[in-house]
C-alpha cells in the first residue's frame, strides 16, 4: 500500500506542477494530506511531496489496521515534519464515551505540547475538549462527523472547527 500511495503522490505532484499551481498568486493551494501509519510511511509521504500528514496516537483513531504512534514516535514525527515544513494532523476521530474523556484530554494535552498542527475530530465532546485544552490548535471535522449540508458546516464553524471533511456519502453534485 505504501508504494501505491507514493506512486499516486508523484502523479498528483506532477499534475500540479504541469498546471503551474505553485500557490503564488492563487486564491487557494491544494494541500496534499497523506496518511502515515508508521515512521516509514511518514518519511515516504514527506519525501514525495506531502504538505501534511495525519496519524494516530493512543486509542482514539478510526484508521482500522493502522498502528498508532507512541509518544516518542509522535515527537519524532513532529520534529521530522516541522524541520521540512510539513504539518502533522492528529486523528481523534472516534466516538469517545464519558469514561474515556479524561484519557482523551490527556492525549490532547500531550499532542499540543509536542506541537501537532491540527486535530481531526469526530466527537463533539472532543471538539469541546480541544477548544478548552489547546485553543491555539486548529480543529478539523473528520468525515466520520458526517457533515453533509451547509448548515452542518456552519454549525461546525460556530463550534470552532476550521476545516470540514464532508461526509463520504455526499454526492459530488451537491458539493459547491
Regions found by a protein language model. Give the residues of each.
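Residue-identity detector for glycine
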Residues: 2, 20-25
Amino acid at each position: 500500500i505504501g508504494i501505491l500511495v507514493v506512486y499516486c503522490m508523484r502523479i498528483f505532484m506532477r499534475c500540479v506542477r504541469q498546471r503551474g499551481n505553485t500557490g503564488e498568486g492563487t486564491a487557494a493551494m491544494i494541500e496534499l494530506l497523506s496518511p502515515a501509519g508508521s515512521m516509514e510511511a511518514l518519511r515516504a509521504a514527506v519525501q514525495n511531496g506531502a504538505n501534511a500528514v495525519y496519524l494516530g496516537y493512543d486509542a482514539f483513531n478510526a484508521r482500522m489496521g493502522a498502528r498508532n504512534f507512541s509518544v516518542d514516535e509522535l515527537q519524532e514525527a513532529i520534529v521530522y515534519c516541522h524541520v521540512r515544513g510539513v504539518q502533522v494532523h492528529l486523528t481523534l476521530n472516534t466516538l469517545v464515551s464519558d469514561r474515556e474523556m479524561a484519557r482523551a484530554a490527556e492525549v490532547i494535552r500531550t499532542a499540543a505540547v509536542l506541537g501537532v498542527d491540527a486535530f481531526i475530530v469526530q466527537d463533539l465532546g472532543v471538539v469541546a475538549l480541544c477548544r478548552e485544552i489547546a485553543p491555539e490548535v486548529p480543529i478539523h471535522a473528520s468525515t466520520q462527523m458526517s457533515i453533509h449540508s451547509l448548515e452542518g458546516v456552519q454549525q461546525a464553524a460556530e463550534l470552532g472547527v476550521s476545516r470540514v471533511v464532508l461526509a463520504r456519502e455526499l454526492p459530488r453534485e451537491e458539493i459547491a
